[in-house]
A protein has these predicted regions:
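C-terminal catalytic subdomain
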Residues: 101-173
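Accessory alpha-helical/coil subdomains and C-terminal extensions
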Residues: 1-134
Length: 173
């Protein structure tokens, strides 16, 4: 999944940077409480100062005003700003950013369904900074894409499946 995120972020960055008009592209990546997958987006950088310029993880509090200031400051050196955010970014009070604009439902386990922080930030950037903004939600593809599957991943998946079937046949739960 990390390889997929890094590669996809790189491709989105290349697309975002073909225009000379100021723009912000916000990429929303899985990660309710752990930001390792979003952190993998840093691997998309080819040099210091390359996009994604800003990466936000759920392990730290997210401040909307500080975010806007950093995006605005990034335009001093870059015409196009790519931002990667974990779906679970939250403010200092623990409120998920995706809840700012909508009532998040709950899944079958009672967890809040997190989606939409990218869209919220896209609208915020557009209205407050007056620049072109768009958001991309990697969503299901980052979890199920086999395009970047490594041989080791495949072997471990087969072994885990075999172990699970054997445990079930032995009556283990």
């Amino acid at each position: 999944a990390a390889r997929y995120v890094a590669s996809t972020v790189r491709e989105i960055t290349l697309d975002a940077c073909v225009y000379e008009k100021k723009s912000v592209t916000i990429i929303e990546i899985m990660g309710r409480h752990a930001g390792w997958l979003t952190g993998a987006a840093a691997l998309a950088r080819k040099y210091v100062g390359d996009n994604p310029l800003l990466i936000y993880l759920p392990e730290t509090d997210f401040d909307v005003e500080e975010f806007l200031q950093k995006v605005h400051a990034a335009f001093e050196k870059n015409c196009n700003v790519v931002v990667c955010v974990s779906e679970g970014i939250h403010d200092k009070d623990g409120t998920f950013i995706c809840e700012y604009d909508s009532a998040a439902g709950t899944d079958a386990f009672g967890h809040k369904m997190l989606a939409g922080c990218g869209k919220y930030l896209e609208n915020l950037v557009r209205s407050r900074l007056g620049v072109k903004a768009r958001s991309v939600e990697l969503n299901v593809s980052q979890r199920c894409s086999a395009a970047m599957l490594a041989g080791t991943d495949q072997q471990e998946g087969i072994l885990a499946g075999e172990f699970g079937v054997q445990a079930a046949l032995n009556g283990e739960t």
